[in-house]
Amino acid sequence: TLLASSAASDVYKRQGIYVAQEKGYFKEAGLDVSVIQPPDDGATDLVASGGAAFGIDFQDTLAAAFSSDSPLPVTAVAAILQHNTSGLISLKKKGIDSPGKLEGHSYATWDSPIEQAVLKNVVEKDGGDFSRVKLISTYVEDIVAALHADIESVWIYYGWDGVKCDMEGLSTNFLPFADMNPTFDYYSPVIIGNNDYMKKNPDTTKAFLSAVKKGYEYAAGNPSDAADILLKAVPELDEKLVQKSQEYLSKQYIADAAQWGEIDANRWNGFYQWLNENKLVDNALDENAGFTMDYLK
């Protein structure tokens, strides 16, 4: 049995995996795949320890895993979404229609050095003073409630929280990081695999990715059906939100790439180079560190 693991908050991004399960793509490939919930410290540690063969993480958060003194033995093997769909959201009435205007307003931070460096870059590039952004350390669970309370801006993934704000009828400004600085069009999220497992089982790894690719291709072409499959697998999700979210994500799975899952070396390396230059990693990341396209066919 192959175990694939990802955090509950990313459940909607597992879409292709659920489709591959429901449509029998794994079975056709001779694979028995179980999707499991990782512990609080995340999917990457579980995959690194061999507790799961594959998992889901993000290029920005993986940087620490790859650059520590004892790097975690995981590698990114496919991009779930072709572009970084995250950005800053705020209520329109706050007037934050460009990143420099975040000055004097509050922002919900999860206190990651990379997160804050990215934010500082876009604010200052737009002429704002980052030291005058009010950083509030908090984890935002309910985006709508947060924006109505004392949080004026939040870093969100549009495919879930942005869609949720639209559904609730909120009038918002959304500033995508990829538009503010092309260096920040990194891969988020990606499928990672355990290095040792993949080395010993290259054919199984290829078969797994091939089935997952079919799943995401199906989701890209059939968002409504894919949403139903996700709701069947995770019934506690909001039905309308899942439908709208899949409508949005269906255009993001492949977007302008030649095929689903493709990771462009220039974009991958560009972001890690920026982390190196800004001393945001313990040890400099080598070119092409942390990803391979060898298993995706």
Whereabouts are the PLM-identified features?
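Ligand-binding cleft/hinge of the Venus flytrap
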Residues: 18-31, 116-135, 163-171
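Flexible hinge/capping segments at coil-to-helix
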Residues: 91-106, 200-202
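Conserved C-terminal helix/tail region of periplasmic/extracytoplasmic solute-binding proteins
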Residues: 268-297
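Pocket-lining segment of extracytoplasmic ligand-binding domains
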Residues: 142-145, 149-234
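Single conserved hydrophobic/aromatic residue that forms the stacking wall/gate
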Residues: 1-8, 12
